[in-house]
Regions:
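A cytosolic small-molecule/anion-sensing beta-strand core signal
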Residues: 44, 60-61, 69, 79
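Short, conserved beta-strand element in jelly-roll/cupin
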Residues: 33-50
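A hydrophobic/aromatic-rich effector-binding and dimerization subdomain
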Residues: 1-21, 72-143, 162, 166-171
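Conserved short histidine dyad/triad with adjacent acidic residue
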Residues: 18-35
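Regular secondary-structure segments
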Residues: 44, 132-146, 191, 195-198, ...
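Short acidic-glycine-tyrosine-enriched beta hairpin
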Residues: 54-66
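Terminal helix-turn-helix DNA-binding modules in bacterial transcription factors
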Residues: 189-196, 201-208, 213, 220-248
């Protein structure tokens, strides 16, 4: 499996991470990767191409795409674009998990055609337009940081979550999707614990015992799915938090 795990840390004081896509200047490729968080790409200008399970999903201005937890994907940005990225920790949807700790969303404006299993774009619905508008508002409020913005931004964020679970959540999924997700979910639980306890004296042996693995097996999990060893991954987490604290 040639893909990497992406470390995602929410913005300071907020229950999500929000930023402009790093490939906005075009001529950009993001290789296959995965993460626990749900990710929404909303294109404001230009276009992007996403690849999920080897299927291409073109995205143009005014459209969005939801990337599910543990969904391996890659991105191509051949031209200049302005794209808002919203990353939502999976725990925000705990109350809506299936028995297998699984939740999946779809984007109504980019669908699969059942006859040929290829994506087909449809005209955005009023709900799709509302979602795009909310994400624009979220980013505008985040940039302004006016007095009391923390309350306004949470109000908009929770309306986005409401649309996701009421309109875009899938209630039926294939068993193969559950199996693929479970393989990555095992490591996701460990990396989530590491992010929440990064200040502590974390050791491979201690985490292996806590989650029911041998030291050797857990070490292989990191090398296979995160593409780095345990020590490097822990250092990356601590460096990311240290950088955020330095900025603040």
């Amino acid at each position: 499996m040639e893909f990497q795990h992406e470390l995602i840390i929410p913005n300071e004081g907020l229950p999500f991470k929000l930023f402009l896509f790093e490939g906005r200047n075009g001529n950009y490729v993001r290789e296959k990767h995965w993460h626990t968080s749900i990710e929404i790409f909303t294109v404001m200008e230009g276009s992007l191409f996403f690849y999920i399970d080897e299927v291409e999903y073109p995205l143009k201005a005014g459209e969005f795409l939801i990337i599910n937890s543990n969904e391996v994907h890659s991105i191509q940005a051949p031209v200049r674009n302005e794209t808002i990225v919203l990353q939502i920790p999976l725990k925000q949807f705990t109350d809506y998990f299936t028995a297998q700790r699984f939740i999946r969303f779809h984007s109504r404006n980019v669908r699969h055609r059942e006859d040929v299993y290829a994506p087909v774009a449809s005209e955005p619905s009023e709900t799709d337009k509302r979602m795009v508008s909310l994400i624009q508002d979220l980013y505008r409020i985040y940039l302004s940081k006016e007095t009391g913005y923390e309350f306004r931004i949470r109000a908009v964020f929770y309306e986005i979550l409401y649309l996701m679970v009421s309109t875009y959540r899938e209630t039926e999924v294939e068993e193969s999707e559950l199996k693929n997700s479970r393989r990555l979910d095992a490591l996701s639980k460990i990396t989530t614990y590491m992010r929440e306890h990064y200040r502590e004296d974390l050791k491979l042996s201690g985490l292996a015992a806590m989650f029911g693995y041998s030291d050797a097996y857990l070490s292989r999990m990191f090398r296979k799915y995160a593409k780095v060893n345990f020590k490097t991954y822990l250092q990356d987490i601590r460096m990311a938090y240290a950088y955020r604290e330095l900025l603040n």
